[in-house]
Amino acid sequence: GGVSRCFYLNLFGLGVFLRVTQGRISHYCFSILGNAGNDAGKNTGNNGGNNMSEAAGADGRAIEFVCRACLASGYLGGINKLTSCLQCGSPRIVAHEELFSLTIAHLDCDAFYASVEKRDNPDLHDKPVIVGGGSRGVVAAACYIARQYGIRSAMPSWQAKRACPELIIIKPRMAHYSAVGSAVREAMSSLTPLVEPLSIDEAFLDLSGTNQLHRKCPAEALVALQQTILKDVGISVSVGLAANKSLAKIASDQDKPDGFYVIGAQEAPAWLADKPVNILFGMGKTSTARLAAENIQTCGQLLAAPEYLLKQHLGRDAGRITALARGEDRRPVTPHRAAKSISSETTFSHDISDKDELIAIADTLTLTVSRRLKQKDLYGGRITLKLKQTDHRILTRSAPLSPPTDKAHRILDEVITLLSGEVGPRKFYRLLGVGVDALQPAGGAGLLDLMDEGAQKQDSLEQALDQLYDKHGDAAIISGRRFAQGYVKPTKK
């Protein structure tokens, strides 16, 4: 019993295999190696996912491995090829020269919403399934069978149905998905308190302390976690393991579903060099298109570009994007502190009763609240309108945001509804505030919006506006209602 470590050495053509359990050699054997035992080849990358056939160290250096089937782990020295686990014979091996020293991981549930539906209904196991709206909606999630037909997220449902007539469309069950996502996060938290949720179905983990806490290196702990989530929750997750958050997130996308991919710190610059720039966090369609117009399409080309050109097209993000292209990212894994609410308010220079003027002010405040939500990767589940009357009495009105959102236009719609019942010719106010609470990690892409292409267009417009605000400041674009009433900048709170 106990945790085993395996060691394999090629000593002048003699293969030596040792299994060490609790500090003692529990098994050993010798074999005479032919050419297959020391195959040529350099590979500092990964062969550690579902279909691994070999694992190799560059220039014959020792590599480290973990078996995803039996959890055996160890070191390989003087050998450049491994076709299966030395303990159980499984080909499902994660191997890399830096495997045991990397501590930052990104876990991503595979085709999350569709996977939950297939878990709950085994009859859907071999069927093409999407979660999304009706004929006028769009795809929120597509299973991997559906993706074989070219179906992808955000595709109009009618187009997906045309691509695959036998497609099964399931309406989203956001509350149910949220519960499943919570179970996955609970499993993550059992490994480390340093869990940073990105959405309902993905998170960063800092596993720096797992050696002391669990007597396992991060790679071993993550392989065990994959097995636990599959067994206890019933869905698969893909893992990216690296030296920082940016590389870990990129890695998790390389081997799906149920994959495990490693990008080492030493290999990162060379690995990224020929990858497209949109692989980097923060490189959206607009920025990517602008760089492409300058013949900058890969990370290597980005690093070779003049600094002034990058600043011209990327603004103040140029330095950050350049660092990411080199494989550098100093952001720590930061668990979301339990923020109870996010709000913004302003006191007027004169008492106001006009509805249009109040809505224009609410528009400005809503924009501030929305951007703070997005910066913190949070959704708000309830909206609160705050009004201070001329006699200093405070009036508050609240309403649920269903589904939760970070979108300014959806928050403003609810604010206008609440405000409509509180305005009149004799109702004067000296302060207006907008706040959201019932906060949760962002995710789900606003599933009800996915049932309405019009809402999707509004979301795309808001995303474009956010990019302009980030690059040029809050006054870059002013809505018509705010312009008509005079731009009002909220006080910070």
Locate the predicted segments by residue.
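Aromatic (phenylalanine/tyrosine) cluster motif
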Residues: 7-8, 12, 17, 28-30
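Residues that scaffold, gate, or flank divalent-cation-dependent active/transport sites
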Residues: 21-32, 52-200, 204
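DNA-contacting surface of Y-family translesion DNA polymerases
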Residues: 54, 60-67, 71, 79, ...
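Hydrophobic alpha-helical hairpins/lids featuring a short glycine-rich hinge
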Residues: 182, 188-236
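Long, highly charged, low-complexity intrinsically disordered interaction regions
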Residues: 217-275
